[in-house]
């Protein structure tokens, strides 16, 4: 039996962070966390690109274009959708996640979903460097691990 598992060793691969501008205070903290996490694991600033889009709805489109470009080994998608008084929140959060999954399955480029879908702004703050950590950091680590794993898989 062969066992395959990625790790956090530095790679020469390029990474891209695609982040929404909507709820900027939260998404900026997620982007900072992702960049610091990659840098802390040996990925140079010149190997990290950041793409900003208006909102979470636009993230899958940008991810698809980037994945098809073939220059990045992994995509880190970051955003924040906070429930409001209408069902719009559900449509945006669900279809964003579905779109990101579709991009990675169709292109073979790992797409890490760090788009927060939360009830309240306090929930987002807790996940953007607060009591629940930083989901940007977590997605960056998962991206690095997946890039290394993809190199190992037959």
From Swiss-Prot:
> In what pathway does it function?
Cofactor biosynthesis; riboflavin biosynthesis; riboflavin from 2-hydroxy-3-oxobutyl phosphate and 5-amino-6-(D-ribitylamino)uracil: step 1/2
Gene3D superfamilies to which the protein is assigned, alphabetical: Lumazine/riboflavin synthase
What reaction is this protein's catalytic activity?
Answer: (2S)-2-hydroxy-3-oxobutyl phosphate + 5-amino-6-(D-ribitylamino)uracil = 6,7-dimethyl-8-(1-D-ribityl)lumazine + phosphate + 2 H2O + H(+)
Q: Which residues form a coiled coil?
A: none
One Pfam family, please name it: DMRL_synthase
Q: Where is the active site?
A: 88
Give the Enzyme Commission number: 2.5.1.78
Where along the chain is 5-amino-6-(D-ribitylamino)uracil bound?
22, 56-58, 80-82, 113
Q: What are the record keywords, sorted?
A: Riboflavin biosynthesis, Transferase
SUPFAM superfamilies for the chain: Lumazine synthase
| Gene Ontology molecular function terms on file | 6,7-dimethyl-8-ribityllumazine synthase activity
Q: Which GO terms describe its cellular component?
A: cytoplasm; cytosol; riboflavin synthase complex
Q: Where does (2S)-2-hydroxy-3-oxobutyl phosphate bind?
A: 85-86, 127
Q: Check the record and name the InterPro entries matching this protein.
A: LS (IPR034964), LS/RS (IPR002180), LS/RS_sf (IPR036467)
A Gene Ontology annotation in the biological process aspect, one of them, is: riboflavin biosynthetic process
Kindly indicate whether the keyword Cytoplasm belongs to this entry: no
**What family does the Swiss-Prot or TrEMBL record give for this protein?**
Belongs to the DMRL synthase family.
NCBIfam families, alphabetically?
lumazine-synth
Q: What does this protein do?
A: Catalyzes the formation of 6,7-dimethyl-8-ribityllumazine by condensation of 5-amino-6-(D-ribitylamino)uracil with 3,4-dihydroxy-2-butanone 4-phosphate. This is the penultimate step in the biosynthesis of riboflavin.
Q: How does it assemble?
A: Forms an icosahedral capsid composed of 60 subunits, arranged as a dodecamer of pentamers.
Name-wise, this protein is 6,7-dimethyl-8-ribityllumazine synthase
**Species assigned in the record:** Xanthomonas campestris pv. campestris (strain ATCC 33913 / DSM 3586 / NCPPB 528 / LMG 568 / P 25)
């Amino acid at each position: 039996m062969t066992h395959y598992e990625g790790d956090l060793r530095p790679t020469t691969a390029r990474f891209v962070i695609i982040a929404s501008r909507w709820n900027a205070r939260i998404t900026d903290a997620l982007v900072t966390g992702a960049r610091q996490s990659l840098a802390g694991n040996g990925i140079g600033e010149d190997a990290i690109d950041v793409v900003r889009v208006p909102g979470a709805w636009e993230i899958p489109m940008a991810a698809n274009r980037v994945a098809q470009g073939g220059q990045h080994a992994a995509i880190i998608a970051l955003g924040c959708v906070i429930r409001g008084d209408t069902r719009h929140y559900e449509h945006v959060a669900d279809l964003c996640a579905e779109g990101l999954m579709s991009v990675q399955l169709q292109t073979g480029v790992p797409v890490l979903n760090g788009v927060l879908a939360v009830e309240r702004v306090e929930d987002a703050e807790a996940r953007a460097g607060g009591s629940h950590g930083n989901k940007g950091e977590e997605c960056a680590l998962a991206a690095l691990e997946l890039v290394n794993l993809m190199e190992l898989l037959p």
